[in-house]
């Protein structure tokens, strides 16, 4: 089980020089330039080309996107035997009080996996959970306040578990978005994103009775198996699960980034009928959807997925664009990326020991800013 911790961030204020002193006029790995120590016609390695052009001759600490992390234990939300607290939301400050929302289980036995799980015994640490919230005056000392959003009524799309929340502040109201599953919870269960809203950060919360985002076009599972990896076709990049929503307000619209799974996660391993299938999408990617209203409809972007790496979605406005922290999975993991349009992300910095599934305190996340200032701490 995870213990919630607070982290602080040092973001350097230097700007990338980004190839201002190097003019590339050959496609044959030859750079002509006026830099000391280099001569016209000198051939360079691919690494040196990147150093001069992409990284602008800077050391990591001179890069404005370079980030280091320090970690401190939270007070008030310490580890508790038999209880899972995880997946903190964006942190908000309302009337000098910080609020964070998170996945929490009741005190129960240890998870037993999908095959052995029952209506009262969890399959994993995010099973049989509700959305709780805690408050703080200083961001370090926290007090758990109770349930914000509980599981839905029996037979509903969210009757098994609600988890991985994020909070949106929009036009004087508050919206919680979260991953949801129904009973029975198996390897092949579809995951959706639900929503509840309130006029206060403390509730009461009004549950939206249908998901606001669902998986995309499905593939086909092998009927003779119950394994998620055993498929006949993949479907869309998010054909199996949409979850870990993370939101910003931009262009007066609600922008939702989310973690996505295709059907067939793990299908690179041998399976009854799936051997030889060409895998079109990574196991973990980041999707993007836009809505005019917090209740939707959320329209998925045609360039999805907007990141082929990462685990949870984590975004914030930065300068005139959108930044994202990519962790845990994929060829571009452990990087800070940025896109002026919020869609076509590029690696801007590599990072070490980033927080997984973090919740950020970012004051301008919902302000529709065109000059994002970043963030300095989170949970």
What are these regions (language model features)?
Residues 1-4:
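Positively charged n-region of N-terminal signal peptides that target proteins for export
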Residues 14-17:
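C-terminal motif of bacterial Sec signal peptides marking the signal peptidase cleavage site
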């Amino acid at each position: 089980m995870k213990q919630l911790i607070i982290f602080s961030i040092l973001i350097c204020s230097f700007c990338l020089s980004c190839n201002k002193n190097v003019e590339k006029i050959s496609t044959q790995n030859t750079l002509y330039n006026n830099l000391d120590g280099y001569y016209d016609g000198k051939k360079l390695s691919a690494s040196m080309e990147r150093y001069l052009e992409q990284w602008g001759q800077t050391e990591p600490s001179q890069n404005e996107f370079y980030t280091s992390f320090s970690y401190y234990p939270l007070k008030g939300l310490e580890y508790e035997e038999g209880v899972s607290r995880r997946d903190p939301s964006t942190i908000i400050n309302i009337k000098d009080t910080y609020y964070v929302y998170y996945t929490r289980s009741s005190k129960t036995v240890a998870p037993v996996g999908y095959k052995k799980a029952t209506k009262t015994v969890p399959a994993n640490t995010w099973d049989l959970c509700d959305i709780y919230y805690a408050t703080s005056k200083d961001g370090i000392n926290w007090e758990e306040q109770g349930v914000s959003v509980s599981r839905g009524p029996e037979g509903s799309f969210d009757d098994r578990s609600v988890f991985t929340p994020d909070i949106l502040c929009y036009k004087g109201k508050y919206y919680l978005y979260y991953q949801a599953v129904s009973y029975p919870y198996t390897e092949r269960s579809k995951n959706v994103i639900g929503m509840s809203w309130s006029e206060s950060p403390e509730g009461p919360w009004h549950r939206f009775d249908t998901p606001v985002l669902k998986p995309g076009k499905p593939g086909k599972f092998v009927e003779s198996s119950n394994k998620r990896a055993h498929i006949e076709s993949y479907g869309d990049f998010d054909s199996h699960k949409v979850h870990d929503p993370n939101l910003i307000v931009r262009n007066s619209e609600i922008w939702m980034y989310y973690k996505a799974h295709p059907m067939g996660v793990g299908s690179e391993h041998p399976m009854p009928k799936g051997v030889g299938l060409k895998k079109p999408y990574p196991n973990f990617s980041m999707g993007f959807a836009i809505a005019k209203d917090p209740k939707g409809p959320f329209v998925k972007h045609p360039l999805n997925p907007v990141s082929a790496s990462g685990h949870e979605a984590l975004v914030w406005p930065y300068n005139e664009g959108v930044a994202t922290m990519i962790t845990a999975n994929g060829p571009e993991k452990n990087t800070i990326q940025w896109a002026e349009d919020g869609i076509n992300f590029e690696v801007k910095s590599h990072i070490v020991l980033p927080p997984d599934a973090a919740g950020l305190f970012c004051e301008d996340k919902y302000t529709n800013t065109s000059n994002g200032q970043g963030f300095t701490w989170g949970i």
